[in-house]
């Protein structure tokens, strides 16, 4: 396993480091690493679940898979991995955190995102390409995609049905925390486009602060034209642009303080 202890001071202004967390049972970590490293100005590194610090990284990715065999519930054991304290602490101070598929489940179990992911309504494992519609275009993960943009992304899960009680659902909609919904090829949200029975066709949500995003589809598997879609790369690029803008703001503030 590859661990990371390089100093953040060694990074250039134009290079960003993403941490890809590896739990026992993760199987999309390589996909995430390849997708991120394929983008200019980005470098991803694996971080083993027993590590305790993510200070060297600009963003965190929790990949798909079957962390700890999905025993008890999907993500229920991974939530107690040593690295998760750092994930939670960094999320609370504004660092970008992305959870795909099993990573989304871990984020819900950790309390970083509301709701829960339960068994698909069909009681079957679903593996197919789906269409998602961007509902929010001012989040750090989708600001490069105008509202209504359609993203073709693959799904592969058995427990991807998003559920939330009525109060939580109202809050999600009121605060514009629903980032993606399953839709048909015309962009219409219909039951037939929903692969797992998720309430209100919800495919991905963010926290109220908008720096934590979880989705069941795999942007990492849609970041190479040879795989049939490059739409997933838009999510990673949006993260890069957000971090770059934040750096520019911080630099400007430092200049003002010196002046």
Please provide the spans of the model-predicted regions.
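N-terminal beta1-alpha1 cap of cysteine-dependent amidohydrolase-like domains
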Residues: 1-100, 108-114, 120-126, 133, ...
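Amide-donor transfer/coupling interface in amidating biosynthetic enzymes
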Residues: 17, 88-92, 117-259
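Conformational gate/switch positions in structured elements
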Residues: 65, 102-103, 158, 219
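Glycine-rich nucleotide phosphate-binding loop and flanking beta-alpha elements
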Residues: 67-68, 104-106, 161-162, 186
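Short, flexible active-site-adjacent loop segments at beta-strand->alpha-helix junctions, enriched
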Residues: 103-104, 138
């Amino acid at each position: 396993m590859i661990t990371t202890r390089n100093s953040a001071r060694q990074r250039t202004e134009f290079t960003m480091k993403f941490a890809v967390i590896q739990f026992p049972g993760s199987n999309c970590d390589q996909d995430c690493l390849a997708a991120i490293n394929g983008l200019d100005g980005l470098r991803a590194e694996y971080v083993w679940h027993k590590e305790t610090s993510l200070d060297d990284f600009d963003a965190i990715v929790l990949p798909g898979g079957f962390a700890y065999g999905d025993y008890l519930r999907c993500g229920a054991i991974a939530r107690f991995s040593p690295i998760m304290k750092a994930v939670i602490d960094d999320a609370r101070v504004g660092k970008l955190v992305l959870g795909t598929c099993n990573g989304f489940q871990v984020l819900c179990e950790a309390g970083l995102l509301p709701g829960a992911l339960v068994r698909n309504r069909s009681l079957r494992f679903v593996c197919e390409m789906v269409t998602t519609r961007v509902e929010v275009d001012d989040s750090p993960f989708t600001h490069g995609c105008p509202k209504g943009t359609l993203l073709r992304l693959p799904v592969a899960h058995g427990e991807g049905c998003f559920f939330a009680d009525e109060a939580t659902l109202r809050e999600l909609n009121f605060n514009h925390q629903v980032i993606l919904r399953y839709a048909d090829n015309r962009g219409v949200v219909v039951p037939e486009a929903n692969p797992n029975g998720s309430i209100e066709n919800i495919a991905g949500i963010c926290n109220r602060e908008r720096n934590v995003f979880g989705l069941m589809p795999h942007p990492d598997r849609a970041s190479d034209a040879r795989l049939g879609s490059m739409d997933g790369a838009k999510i990673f690029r949006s993260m890069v642009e957000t971090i770059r803008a934040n750096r520019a703001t911080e630099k400007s503030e430092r200049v003002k303080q010196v002046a």
